[in-house]
Amino acid sequence: MTKSLGYISLGCAKNLVDTEVMLGLLKDDGYTITDNLYEADLIIINTCTFIEKAKEESINTILEAAQYKETGRCKGLIVAGCLSQQYQDELFTEIPEIDALIGTGAWDQVMVAVDAIEHGNRSCIMENITNIYDERMPRIQTTPRYSAYVKIAEGCNNGCTFCIIPKVRGAFRSRSIESIKAEVERLAASGVKEIVLIAQDTTSYGIDLNNGKPLLTELLKELTKVEGIEWIRMLYLYPTFFSDELLDIIVNEPKLCKYVDIPLQHVNNNILKQMNRRDSREDIERLLKKIRNAPTHVTLRTSIIVGFPGETDEQFQELCEFVKDIKFDNMGVFTYSQEEGTIAGAREDQIPEEVKEERYHTLMSIQAAISEENNRDLEGTIDYAMIEELEEGDNDTVLAKGRLKSQAPDVDGNMYIEDCGDKVKPGDIVQVQVEQGFAYDVVATIVE
């Protein structure tokens, strides 16, 4: 009898990779994947606990999935990921519908959990937080066939005072260059054209393998040799180890997207110190100046936290002026989330929620105007774009949706071609001219 598997993966792309590996292991055991949770014999929820809203979403998703034990075919509910790692006792006690909990380093034990369910037992598998997958693990790609995430490291050593990740993901540990390259070669052979390299701290890649010195540029040099891969993109480039050598290869290697995602979180020196960030405002300014002065334009993305404990109006205004001055191409803004088990979470000078929300909307409004200005500056320029979706428009036209080489999947805006006819299909990389720029998206035409 065919066994069906339903899943929901929450949180970041790093979590999604863990989900894809678990799906691969279950498929090897005979499960078929269904998009309809009502029809699933087994349901896996891979959870996130990074901020309070992520916790709430995870819990609500678990409760919704638990209903399929009564209304659907579900005979086993497995909850994996960061929420499981952090709140295992509470989850098992308060949600009895959960059959198994799998920690962040125990994704490769998913079949042990399934076996326990089949024997009528509940299980909680939390050991081996030092684990990391490699190229030998089966993996079911859930992203479009032409684009895939590749996790090059796991865990984090930075110890930011607002963040729970080191406690739930463990110490920083890198995969070998050989393992990553072998996986990328396999992905390329399956039709992947774009790889997105991810880690909690991507620029620190290799420090645990090379006496404290990063190996990211060495990794990139090897990955550019893989035939079939046309775009290589990196996310989560922590500023401390962002070297001149790394900038040089980004600028000069054709396969590398001229795209830099640097999570700065803040720029006020007192706030940065209280966050336990290694870089000062002056360090940040020097780095961004180098990137802005590069011989080729490099798209800049960052993420910012507003409402950190003790953040004054003056410190927030300093942040706003900095954003106006740098003019980031893309920016994610988060309101500070008071997390249990963190140093910042224990502070008494928490900012009221209404103040955090006001600061969030203020900064997002500033960035929207900057993004629109930057996108308008793209009008008339030529770039490469990846086609992702086609849909019927008015008067028998075909609308194409995709991304410029300067736009990352899931987090940035989109590129639209209003009438592409039958010239393109999903996965194609084509040359386009930007015709109109808006706050987050652009409209383009294909260059014949």
Regions found by a protein language model. Give the residues of each.
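Radical SAM enzyme [4Fe-4S]-AdoMet core and its adjacent flexible, acidic
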Residues: 12, 206-224, 228, 274-275, ...
